[in-house]
Amino acid sequence: MSAILPGYAELHCQSNFSFLQGASHPEELVTRAGELGYAALALTDECSLAGVVRAHVEAREQKLPLIIGSSFTLQAGADAPPLDLTLLAQNREGYGNLAELITLGRGRAAKGQYLLTPADIEAPAGDNAHLRGMPDCLAILAPPPGLAAERLAEQARWLAAQCPGRAWIGLTLLHHCRDDLHRAAVEHAAHASGLPIVALGQAQMHRRSRKPLHDTLAAIRTGRSVGQCGYDLAANAERHLRSRLRLASLYPAQALAQTLAIARRCTFSLDELQYEYPDEIVPAGHTPASYLRQQTYLGARQRFPEGMTPAVAAQVEKELALINELRYEAYFLTVYDIVGYARSQGILCQGRGSAANSAVCYCLGITAVDPARGNTLFERFISKERNEPPDIDVDFEHQRREEVIQYIYEKYGRQRAALTAVVISYRPRSVLRDTGRALGVDNGIIDAVARAHQWWDGKKEMLRSLAACGLDPASRVARQWAELAETLMGFPRHLSQHPGGFVISRGKLSRLVPIENAAMPGRSVVQWDKDDLDALRLLKVDVLALGMLSVLRRALALAGQRRGRPLALHEIPPDDDATYDMICAADTIGVFQIESRAQMSMLPRLRPRQYYDLVVQVAIVRPGPIQGGMVHPYLRRRQGREDITYPGPAVRKALARTLGVPIFQEQVMQIAVDAAGFTPGEADALRRSMAAWRRKGGVDKFRAQLVGGLLARNYTADFAQALFRQIEGFGEYGFPESHAASFALLAYASSWLKCHEPEAFLAALLNSQPMGFYAPAQLVQDARRHGVRVLPADVLYSGWEASLQDAPGAARPAVRLGLNLVKGLREDSARAIEQARVRRPFADTADMARRAGLPRQALDALAAADALRTLAGHRRLASWQAAASAQSRDLLREAVIVETETPALPAPSEGQTVAADYRSVGLTLGRHPLALLRPQLAARNFQTAAVLNTYPNRRLARACGIVTVRQRPQTAKGTIFVTLEDETGPINAVVRPELIERQRRELLDATLLGIYGTWQSVDGVRHLVAQRLVDLSSLLGQLSQDGLAAASRNFH
């Protein structure tokens, strides 16, 4: 049957990258087109190429010709209807023109929108003149049903004139009552213009079963429920990829034949894209290769003042030779230039990831990991066999990274540099809110359901939870809601900007990939994400933000001021016993990487005592080692409870530093090379295939090669199979040793500062917010438990940021909180206070308000935060004086402060003060809220953290505290880890899945949570395994009628 049906190529197809229009993924459309025997498929998302790389990768696997195109609605003016146009790239030149047209339209409009007119094709101006008539693109007029015949004829004549010999008029038949009228109008226009007619499906779904989702997307797009959409919904499900039999029964044979004629003319493939990195940073008289060599050896003199060892020198030469062979010199030099700029501006930066395997990167100052200090594996970074570009990630201070980004824009221009996109996809709460509104569900129920689904366990689990949220799980709307939510989960919602992945080109970047405006002013993004760039082997440089680098620079500066001399990062003693004692005790709140619950649980068991131990510590608390079953064997061997054994000498070479247990990706690769006969490039291909294993499978060939190679070298079958299972456990979650080594440097530096300069460290943490795992309230409480004196924000002493303040007779300074913690206070108001205070002290609130020119809002915020206490007294008095002192904003007359007598107002209670602290500053320096509630909690037998820490293993216990952190790691099989805080410290709790389902609302909604359970204390790791949860948030109302505004950090 298939052989006698007319051939067909779908030339107008929109995926879900036509956001809230297409109801199928690009891959689904490609796969379905192949199943239906289409000759080709054109992906034509609206003014976008965001989905084409995904379609390209799938089409390559399906061996289906993919046509690259895009659809547009050209705004023809108030008196004319819009013109719907589809453009298809014939060749590389046509593709570049198409990408530039998309860039032009997107650049004129706000993020997520575009604006193009017929004039942009008929007579484009200036630098876009070459786009006139869209050379090397085929054009199809795609009129909507209902367009008047004469209007359509006019549009057809215009298109025929603009694209002679390259234009068609599309006929779309959707089994609609207007099909005959539409066909007549199209035939009339074709006759009037001389354009041939081509069949178009205008598909937006791969199967008709997506029609309910298609309707839901229309409702979301228009902000109404499905029931209110009426004619905005498609009349039927015909906008799917239809069978050739169905198409043959609807369309004239000639219209179907034209689809094949057009497909034959479109020969362009994304594989043709060639990317050239900029080379202007190479000075005259040098080639990129000679300049890279010169700078590498100049850097080596600084890195190795006593000279490189023969092994390092050989490694440098090996790397330079491979970089030259693959022609990556300009890429390395570009990153080198960016890092050099940052350092010239005093911005801390450090390379990480696989780049830390490179001796060249170390010599250039891009990375900080000495290749002579670890087991680096350059093939993890660059491999000739892999034939994929290297990826250099560089972290910069998060508060100054924008300076680096603007340097790149200024150096290369916005036509040659743009950020990589990130596809923002539907997640549980956004899915449930949008689909719930589309179905007309009550807003109260939607909010309750969304709050109860911080993660997604599938529609069955959703239905089980609906009853507690006020909806019958057996109702039709509940079943529809669950079905739609599961289908929409993971759909792209819009494009955002990557944290810092830059694409920089030698020529015009918009001819390689379309560029559009970002939401943030001064930023532009390409329409592809990092996976798209990787799939096409396009280079990018990651200019990433890392809060801890900001902390380190600030803390070193503050510590240097206290010591009377500058303190640099490299001056931190490398093997400080006190620092490692603190780390082994899991006293790591606020430090880098080892502050999470999982890391803190591991520290007392692994007990790091040197730098490489920290490298292992950073890497071992990852899904890869955990899923691969490597954690417990390593710990048993480290603690002397299990013998260290190796299956053979070749394996010993790779695993000696980790006690015979593979922890790092490089070790997996090294075993494949040393013990199974892989080349280094094949070994990295094995690692990368494991990253895709969970998504696509396809590692059987590596299984055979690895197991066969090991058996051929006399390793046992049991070992070979066990090793492969461990490798599978890594998946995409294993840490490269080079990455862990980079992070371990920062983990140690931050730990040393916390141990020896706790005041500077706390101030730096507060001044670098938002960042890290803990909120300022927890950071301050932890510092105070360690003896750090913290003083409140005060207009007489505080600057915008936290600072160190000496006190007479005190051995160490106190930390004075900054005005940046005051909610509702702008920085310019705080700076004005500082400047006015320098001239002379303030006499009173009115004097401060007048001299600093403060608006009423700023005065109210300062009063609420108790920052006027030394000028005005307690909060109530301060609020009265703030109102009396507010300057008139009338610019026509001089501001006058009216003298009024302050009434005798009672001071707020201690509970009211604490509650007001949390509302206005986010923390309190008074007694902890639970200290005030301790009598009530003691009456219910809730114990403090200090008491619980004395309990033996397996004792029944009760704990209560303010929820500060909720976590649900991927490897925990649905378990949630909760951190509570009381007046004596943190309490770690474990909540199992069966309890979560019974008490989801208490777990997710409570601010003050009581937990009944069993205390566990093993090897210095202590936590409470929950058996029952109680929401005690109502007790906080005893402090203040507004409760306590204590925020937790959830599911980071």
Curated annotation (Swiss-Prot):
GO terms assigned for molecular function: 3'-5' exonuclease activity; DNA-directed DNA polymerase activity; nucleic acid binding
Pfam families: DNA_pol3_alpha (PF07733), DNA_pol3_finger (PF17657), HHH_6 (PF14579), PHP (PF02811), tRNA_anti-codon (PF01336)
Keywords recorded for this protein, A-Z: Cytoplasm, DNA damage, DNA repair, DNA replication, DNA-directed DNA polymerase, Nucleotidyltransferase, Transferase
Location in or out of the cell: Cytoplasm
Cysteine-cysteine disulfides: none
One GO CC term, this protein: cytoplasm
Entries under InterPro entries matching the protein: DNA_pol3_alpha_NTPase_dom, DNA_pol3_finger, DnaE2, DnaE2/DnaE/PolC, DNAPol_HHH, NA-bd_OB_tRNA, PHP_dom, Pol/His_phosphatase_N
PANTHER family: DNA POLYMERASE III SUBUNIT ALPHA, ERROR-PRONE DNA POLYMERASE
Family to which this protein belongs: Belongs to the DNA polymerase type-C family. DnaE2 subfamily.
HAMAP family in the record: DNApol_error_prone
Listed name of the protein: Error-prone DNA polymerase
Protein species of origin: Bordetella bronchiseptica (strain ATCC BAA-588 / NCTC 13252 / RB50)
